A protein has these predicted regions:
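Residues forming the flavin
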Residues: 1-253
Length: 253
């Protein structure tokens, strides 16, 4: 399956075209392993290179929030984002009804993944929702702003309806998730409604949101700040995206 749906791909074609016509040299598949003001150390086309620059714009993107929990290193336990990429690129998740998948966490990525799993015929034993009702109430105050981007709201509603039609059991207010098994995942244990429950599963896909990927900027000792609401560290930038390190700016997450 394609990584983007046709509408998303079409929306990005204009940006790609303008970039291709800008005169910038494009090196796909490059690995950056060193960064300092005015210099980038990397591997391009299998060769180590050092590039000099008057200014560097870093776009490290985001990553899934790491969520350690009992049994999280067992084979069969992985992040939802990684599982979605595997599913769409190679269809590696089993559609065997005797090898059910459990989703755990909260956020729109789980909606997207659940839809892709259902399309691929992968059975979903349950969705363990770890979201807090208090946060949902807080988010409700932002709903009127949705009228400014109705296509995006419609996309979210479409994903939610797909899960409802698939009759995925959604268990709310889940806490204390544990992955249990000897040499691979055998069941998922969790608390909900004041009781402990368990579900047989061969795969557990956990997701608790996206956070900025800060590794390369931390290596530069760039100034970061803690977001107490989103609960992550992020680079401190000015209105033009400049970081606290001279000659280094950031774009995106």
């Amino acid at each position: 399956q394609a990584l983007l749906d046709p509408k998303e791909r079409s929306a990005g074609l204009g940006l790609v075209k303008r970039f291709r016509e800008s005169g910038a040299t494009y090196y796909p598949g490059t690995t950056v392993w060193g960064l300092e003001p005015h210099r980038v150390s990397c591997t391009m086309n299998g060769k180590a290179e050092e590039l000099a620059a008057s200014h560097i714009i870093v776009a490290p993107g985001g990553m899934e929030r790491p969520v350690p929990f009992p049994g999280w290193t067992l084979p069969g336990v992985m992040g939802a984002g990684g599982a979605d990429i595997l599913l769409r690129s190679g269809g590696t998740l089993s559609a065997d009804k005797n090898a059910p998948v459990v989703l755990a966490g909260n956020g729109p990525l789980l909606l997207l993944l659940a839809g892709h799993l259902l399309e691929a015929g992968v059975p979903i034993a349950a969705w363990l929702d770890t979201g807090w009702w208090s946060r949902r109430i807080m988010a409700g105050a932002l709903m009127p702003a949705g009228v400014l981007d109705m296509p995006y709201v419609a996309k979210g509603m479409k994903m939610a309806l797909r899960v409802l039609k698939g009759k995925v059991p959604i268990i709310r207010n889940v806490t204390n998730i544990r992955a249990v098994g000897s040499d691979h995942l055998e069941k998922v244990v969790y608390d909900a409604g004041g009781k402990t429950h368990e579900i047989n599963a061969s795969t557990l896909l956990r997701h608790e949101g996206i956070i900025p990927r800060t590794h390369i900027l931390n290596s530069l000792n760039a100034k970061h700040a803690w977001d107490g609401v989103q609960r992550y560290w992020h680079p401190v930038v000015d209105e033009n995206g400049r970081t606290s390190v001279d000659g280094i700016s950031i774009a995106g997450d």
